[in-house]
Amino acid sequence: MKSLDDLDFDNRFARLGGAFSTEVLPDPIAEPRLVVASPAALALLDLPAETSDEALFAELFGGHKLWSEAEPRAMVYSGHQFGSYNPRLGDGRGLLLGEVINQAGEHWDLHLKGAGQTPYSRMGDGRAVLRSSIREFLASEALPALGIPSSRALCVIGSSTPVWREKKESAATLLRLAPSHVRFGHFEYFYYTRQHDQLKQLAAFVLEHHFADCNAAERPYAAMFRQVVERNAELIARWQAYGFCHGVMNTDNMSILGITFDYGPYAFLDDFDANHICNHSDDAGRYSFSNQVPIAHWNLAALAQALTPLVEVDELRASLDLFLPLYQAHYLDLMRRRLGLGVAAENDQALVQELLQRMQGSAVDYSLFFRRLGEETPERALASLRDDFVDREAFDRWAEAYRRRVEEEGGDQESRRRRMHAVNPLYVLRNYLAQQAIEAAEQGDYTEVRLLHQVLSRPFEEQPGMERFTRRPPDWGRHLEISCSS
């Protein structure tokens, strides 16, 4: 095991030079204290799960202390925000502290969010608030537990530093981990500023360190873009299958690695609503739940445009054309598994779409429906679920088709139950649960956020005494729209 103050650094991105980032030191927050830490994320750096030295966490990630090998830098990038190009964004409140190598030889970026002002702060104060930091921490660790690729969160540090958003709040920092923090917007920045040499330098860097298998291809950059398309098709399929709504799918929030990145006003669906908008700033619903698939394709097309100096347009288009069929294949496979079906059949897509149509407008909890469906035999489970649907006759027709499908596939009920429980979570990160943990933390009580994190790290297992985390939201917690302010 390593110790927190003795990590091995290899700052590859910093070596790209000043065109890609600016050296900035963290601005310390006052009276830093550890709010919550993730044992699973600590393990990625070969660190012990126990956070016995909370003072060291607070010093390092509150900006008061820095490793001698760290090279904190603010990265420059641009991006399309709600469909409009913003020519200069960059890390306005976050710093890439450096890259740490673990014992397996993996590189992990250490990125401190809320580290203070940078040249890219755009009139902002460079701070993150406790509320948004806790939300990002919880999601960064909850999604991987569901099998959804994501950046990770090591810890949240609270403080007494005041910041003003809609109201006075307290500043916090979040230490984010990812194999890379390169975004679609990095490529867009160098493309639209016509810095094509730097664009190629960035592409070569990403190719070498994150898509090395593409080097053997006849046209490596074309092969790399195809893999980016493939990864994003699978990522979005997982979002849709598990009812995750990102909320701000700007191109600067899209990771080149195809992982969930830059959490803001996200939500998991409570009642199923294909048109759910979780971001209260998204008046037009550009980033609604149902729009995530076409928006991901749109964002990939924006990245493709930025790569035109390196890849032939026909090759980029051919890869883009793969996105939808790849997405559909991944999504149908996941939904088939959530329904307890192990073998593909011709009418599976219709079976899934009919179920979602029946759910729309009904008081059906999206996550608990699948969990309850696997609890008992199909006949008994379907009978107990029937009352949640508005059009019960239509549900009965779907239920009969599903029952026949299960019967045709065969197998015993216990095996079916185990399969379904392995892919259908009992615990999901509902906004009302996060809000309750945040409100307690804002009063200095971190018990709830730590307990919620612990429960969400094992979403498929029944955890005695944790039944309250399975409950549907109260009236005040249904369909919450979250602010972008953070």
Curated annotation (Swiss-Prot):
ATP binds at G90, G92, R93, K113, D125, G126, R176, R183, D262. It is an enzyme of class 2 (transferase). The keyword Manganese applies. Mg(2+) binds at N253, D262. Keywords: ATP-binding, Magnesium, Manganese, Metal-binding, Nucleotide-binding, Nucleotidyltransferase, Transferase. Its EC number is 2.7.7.-, 2.7.7.108. Its cofactor is Mg(2+); Mn(2+). It catalyses: L-seryl-[protein] + ATP = 3-O-(5'-adenylyl)-L-seryl-[protein] + diphosphate; L-threonyl-[protein] + ATP = 3-O-(5'-adenylyl)-L-threonyl-[protein] + diphosphate; L-tyrosyl-[protein] + ATP = O-(5'-adenylyl)-L-tyrosyl-[protein] + diphosphate; L-histidyl-[protein] + UTP = N(tele)-(5'-uridylyl)-L-histidyl-[protein] + diphosphate. GO terms for molecular function: AMPylase activity; ATP binding; magnesium ion binding. The active site is at D252. Nucleotidyltransferase involved in the post-translational modification of proteins. It can catalyze the addition of adenosine monophosphate (AMP) or uridine monophosphate (UMP) to a protein, resulting in modifications known as AMPylation and UMPylation. Belongs to the SELO family. This is Protein nucleotidyltransferase YdiU.
